[in-house]
Amino acid sequence: MAIGLVGRKVGMTRIFTEDGTSIPVTVIEATPNRVTQLRTEESDGYRALQVTAGTKKANRINKAEAGHFAKAGVEAGRTLVEFRLEENEGADIEVGSEITVEIFNDTKKIDVTGTSKGKGFQGAIKRWNFSSQRMTHGNSLSHRAPGSIGQNQSPGKVFKGKKMAGQLGNKQVTTQSLEVVRVDVENGLILVKGAVPGATGNDVIVKPAVKA
């Protein structure tokens, strides 16, 4: 897994190419990520890089977190994220150093992970894209009902995983192979073509695309 960044979804806008083509983009603010820990094969059984981003009020930090950040010599952040490292990756990175959007200067496509917008309890039509039943012609009660959910006495149960009504959204989602339109190192911004998961202001994890 490649090294990535923790950013924040600012919102969507559009930019124009030289020939006047409009490109919809999502703006991701990725302030410098501070390295809080380096996990090693010897002590942890795997190699990884742990970073934090943003800030957090001192009265919102417990003693364990405060000690962890103090040991790394960095300001307390709002989240902790790990990126797995390959065998020879991250050799020049030290605890307390910073990682900026510069790492994406030569990257053409990225994967963005975030928490999708929560929609609450939704029916099978909205949640699973089921077709609705007839609005008339004898149907007076089951317009948006899912239909049959099983068989008869055999097997005599509803199988696990059956698509039914329930909680929609508020899940971790990764959108893959999004095109990087622009990287603004000075302002710590990444402009990505298209939409990314989550609401405006949510944290997102940006990594080089796996399927690039």
Curated annotation (Swiss-Prot):
Which GO molecular function annotation, any one, does this entry have?
rRNA binding
Which keywords does UniProt give here?
A: Methylation, Ribonucleoprotein, Ribosomal protein, RNA-binding, rRNA-binding
Modification type N5-methylglutamine: residues: 153
Q: Where is this region: Disordered?
A: 135-161
What does the entry's PTM section describe? Methylated by PrmB.
Q: Which GO terms describe its cellular component?
A: cytosolic large ribosomal subunit
| GO BP terms in the entry | translation
Q: Which domain of life is it from?
A: Bacteria
Pfam families attached to this UniProt entry: Ribosomal_L3
Q: Which family does it belong to?
A: Belongs to the universal ribosomal protein uL3 family.
* Purpose of the protein: One of the primary rRNA binding proteins, it binds directly near the 3'-end of the 23S rRNA, where it nucleates assembly of the 50S subunit.
Q: How does it assemble?
A: Part of the 50S ribosomal subunit. Forms a cluster with proteins L14 and L19.
Protein name (database record) = Large ribosomal subunit protein uL3
Q: Which gene encodes it?
A: rplC
